Amino acid sequence: MTITPQNLIALLPLLIVGLTVVVVMLSIAWRRNHFLNATLSVIGLNAALVSLWFVGQAGAMDVTPLMRVDGFAMLYTGLVLLASLATCTFAYPWLEDYNDNKDEFYLLVLIAALGGILLANANHLASLFLGIELISLPLFGLVGYAFRQKRSLEASIKYTILSAAASSFLLFGMALVYAQSGDLSFVALGKNLGDGMLNEPLLLAGFGLMIVGLGFKLSLVPFHLWTPDVYQGAPAPVSTFLATASKIAIFGVVMRLFLYAPVGDSEAIRVVLAIIAFASIIFGNLMALSQTNIKRLLGYSSISHLGYLLVALIALQTGEMSMEAVGVYLVGYLFSSLGAFGVVSLMSSPYRGPDADSLFSYRGLFWHRPILAAVMTVMMLSLAGIPMTLGFIGKFYVLAVGVQAHLWWLVGAVVVGSAIGLYYYLRVAVSLYLHAPEQPGRDAPSNWQYSAGGIVVLISALLVLVLGVWPQPLISIVRLAMPLM
């Protein structure tokens, strides 16, 4: 196989982030400097983001049998890079008072971002597995980064063991699919799985095992048990990455698999996915009702959001509107989650032991940090799907797609789940405006809005509001990615 200059241009984001990993690694070996290594990481991620323009000029192409670069890959690569950039930005003030080694944090985030980019471009079950492992392995270290805290260490061990088990299910499922189809490429699977072949027991077992592995990575019920504990135990910036980049990259590659291989044509698989979606929506929202820890609440909330997205995935065979719905919903979910976890990161910075994740820590926040409280309110309203926010546009799309595909009981689950979600999101928002306790526990720095993390949070809030009122630019970008699939 010959690598041409066009191929190299198409792989620019992957190459730039890979080069940044090497540069940061050498920088750490030469001299430890927190500011220098954080700056190098942010420059590398920004350069990768800018390089997407050049990738767009090169056009869609299969760079290798494992990777396809097109509009779809560019959209999801951009979302992963934005989430990674926000994670590094939130991590810098959090790590300022951290007594152990700080620099490896950025190295692990960059390697995980590399895995996310690989997933966005994956066109083969081998690259899907490599990407998932490349994004998961650094997260084992990141989740347990505050290892002197028992909760963080426990979360890391739990995530490592369960993730390894999920990967084994995924790999075994791929082996069964290969045994039946004779190929691992998404396109070849689409060609080979015709004429009722999807009803073969071996193939159904293979895809069933893959659903178990991918369901764990996406925190879908009943493979979700790790989610609230890991979100709570992980440092706030790591929870940001887990909730955004990791989920978006994996859901993106699942979308591509369903587009090329007619997995959704099997009635048995559709029923299983519908049950998982229904359970994720209802259970995720019900469990969030009783939470008094914001990170656990957002963890259960992410389970329900992935359930909503699964509704659009099940309806994928009905038309292009499903792809549009997933793209718009994921962008809304990205900015809403970045804003919510960003506020938690700002409240928890610099590192002083456990994060400010108790709901009591946010009581009366409006009276001494009004702008920060307003930002958190906007994020809660967007996650709840209130009109005039980007979250509403995404949820409306999902409902429209469900109605179009006649998935009536899933549409009912989305409506009921949204109603339940409204209660606990508003509970967080209302607590921000109650009378502040006489001795508040934790507080954000007085100049938080001038920090890089503060700027990211403010921009996220602005985008959630502006795109909620005028979503056409976002819809146009998502549509641009679709014909190139």
Swiss-Prot record:
EC numbers on record: 7.1.1.-
InterPro entries xref list: NADH-Q_OxRdtase_suN/2, ND/Mrp_TM
Any one GO cellular component localisation term in the record: plasma membrane
Record's subcellular location: Cell inner membrane
Membrane topology: Multi-pass membrane protein
Cited Pfam families: Proton_antipo_M (PF00361)
Transmembrane segments annotated in the record for this chain: 8-28, 35-55, 71-91, 105-125, 127-147, 159-179, 203-223, 235-255, 271-291, 297-317, 326-346, 373-393, 408-430, 455-475
Single GO MF descriptor: NADH:ubiquinone reductase (non-electrogenic) activity
Keywords assigned by UniProt, alphabetized: Cell inner membrane, Cell membrane, Membrane, NAD, Quinone, Translocase, Transmembrane, Transmembrane helix, Transport, Ubiquinone
Recorded catalytic activity of this chain's protein: a quinone + NADH + 5 H(+)(in) = a quinol + NAD(+) + 4 H(+)(out)
Gene Ontology terms: biological process: ATP synthesis coupled electron transport
Quaternary data: NDH-1 is composed of 13 different subunits. Subunits NuoA, H, J, K, L, M, N constitute the membrane sector of the complex.
Alphabetized NCBIfam families for the sequence: NDH_I_N, PRK05777.1-1
Family of the protein in this entry: Belongs to the complex I subunit 2 family.
Annotated HAMAP family: NDH1_NuoN_1
Role of this protein: NDH-1 shuttles electrons from NADH, via FMN and iron-sulfur (Fe-S) centers, to quinones in the respiratory chain. The immediate electron acceptor for the enzyme in this species is believed to be ubiquinone. Couples the redox reaction to proton translocation (for every two electrons transferred, four hydrogen ions are translocated across the cytoplasmic membrane), and thus conserves the redox energy in a proton gradient.
Protein name: NADH-quinone oxidoreductase subunit N
